[in-house]
Amino acid sequence: AWYYGIYSAGSAMVAAQDGSFQDDHTGTANAWDRQFPATGRVIFPFSLRVSSLVEASYKKEMEKLKAGQTFDLMTKPTNYTDAHGACVAYLSGSAAWWKWKTESAIVGSREFKALNVTNFRTKAARELRDSRLVGKSLSFLHQAFRYRGKANYREALFLGYGDYVESSLSNYLDDLTIVLRGFLAMSGAFACKRLGLSIWNLISNERQPPESSAGAAASRLRRRAGAARSRS
């Protein structure tokens, strides 16, 4: 539910901006990144991004974002500096994960197989890899997609592994809610500004059940923003 709230709100921003809907979640993340973080139109920490998945390039960008700070994601943040460090640390891990995911796809491609190699040690293989990685940026929606996979398919396995893991998950759901509400507030503010107050009021005043969640609100925003933009 958390992820689909983030996804729907991000998709609503894209729909409000240009009226488009993407075919898949990665397409939505790419469109959102190009139109918002890449142009400086989102608030921190949702603005954090790297512009390339070439390892040498994104590591240079990460060093600038770290500003000399380091942070362990197993340690609970206690202040702004810690929180900034945690966001940057997760971005770094996400960049490495998306790089690996892209490389795995390259290895299965016809172009790679034509090189008659099994890894990226040759110059030709590295050039093919980097040509695919250089144009791939990464920002918050990509990280949310990765987090959804981790939460659904991996981290749940460790929930019963004793007091240590349970203590690390204190306030977990509350923290997820804070992130979703913050992202939804930003998305709603953009949609209101982009579509105009009269259309925004129609969206925000739409009758909804009292138990309606932030994720459901994001889904309605996505649907209405696309419809409103297509009429304008």
Language-model region placement:
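Terminal alpha-helical segments
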Residues: 1-232
